[in-house]
Amino acid sequence: MKAEILCVGTELLLGDIVNTNAQYISKELANIGIEVYHHSVIGDNENRLLKELERAFNYCDLVITTGGLGPTKDDLTKESVAKFFQEDLVLHEKSLKQIEKRLSCFNKSMTESNRKQAYFPKNCEILENPNGTAPGFIIEKDNKIAIILPGPPYEMQPMFENKVIPYLEKLTNSTIKSKVLRITGIGESDVADLISDILESQTNPTVAPYAKQGETTLRITAKANSEEKALSLIVPIEKKIRQILGDNIYGSGETLLEEVVANILVKRNLTIATAESCTGGLLAGKLINFPGISSVFLEGAITYSNESKINRLNVKKETLEKYTAVSKEVALEMAEGIAKSAGTNIGISTTGVAGPGGGTYDKPIGLIYIGLYINGKTFVEELNYSGNRQFIRNITVTRALDFLRRNLE
């Protein structure tokens, strides 16, 4: 089955709203083995939407739309789809009552504009919306399937998960299961080179690498006539990949790197404090996202100036004068200083040149040092990155977390 995603809304074209719906739907369709061939964004215009539907159905069996189901006059998706399938719009009494009930929860009464949201093509399957006033629907005709969903993600995603996926799984006549491996420390091209034999010989399961900032994910997808069989096909491929990539794999599924690190700290009861310069608190922020981290995370200090490094972390003035703030020597003294002042097992530090200014020939923009102190032992890592200030700061945090993980495992 081939699919296209049409996201409707002039606000998307103007850049007022980020289109996360296409990403979410594409990912979910890939999980059940449906190929997405095209994404389109269309303004609130009936003629353009009709043309897009005609173009999409020339090569796709399935078109999924999001947006344009609201109560205003420029919400035209439903009308356009009904016209394309040559269906009349009729009032659906059950939906009308549900919309009225939802409005009453907010002390609002039914208006003619809201009443419009209860009209649907005569021959369609209506998808209830417990999170809003815009139900979706599925319409099938002449081997064409259109699935029409609301635009707000908090309405669309539950509808897609609870209604659309079960509907589509019945059409595929097979079970598709996926497992995601999360990798950091090596880039997508290095991962692809290391597992090239697997990528070149893949059939079922398939293995697909995806690059993200600071990490790579590998999605292993298997198709079979049962869930048990599909999962069993994944096992030997996953084992082979783990043997090749080793500790570059930090987790699987939706696991985050900071979650892995925090779990290690909590399970081993290792207390930690952070001393940050170029990352300005981002590292501490990542760690404290994890529930339960308060039992081991004692302190986070942002020591941006040389004076604060000296006064707060006991970094030696002589070290700063001899090596400058951006140096492995200072990174190590920062890590040890925060650990000793906070009384923790671990101290971790970041210092570097994030840009856009401040770089020199000897200390260019993107030069970063991560210092680590663990129960009397010290470690340091030097990094060199190119990119804008935010990228360099974010990648430094990822590398710091991974540096800590590898030295704890």
UniProtKB/Swiss-Prot annotation:
Q: CDD domains, per this entry?
A: cinA (cd00885)
Please give the superkingdom of this protein's source: Bacteria
Q: Which InterPro entries match?
A: CinA, CinA-like_C, CinA_C, CinA_KH, Competence-induced_CinA, MoaB/Mog-like_dom_sf, MoaB/Mog_dom
A Pfam family that this protein carries is CinA
Q: What family is reported?
A: Belongs to the CinA family.
Q: PANTHER family, per this entry?
A: NICOTINAMIDE-NUCLEOTIDE AMIDOHYDROLASE PNCC, NMN AMIDOHYDROLASE-LIKE PROTEIN YFAY
Q: HAMAP family, per this entry?
A: CinA_B (MF_00226_B)
NCBIfam families, per this entry?
cinA_nterm, molyb_syn, PncC_domain, PRK00549.1
Name of the protein: Putative competence-damage inducible protein
The species is: Clostridium botulinum (strain 657 / Type Ba4)
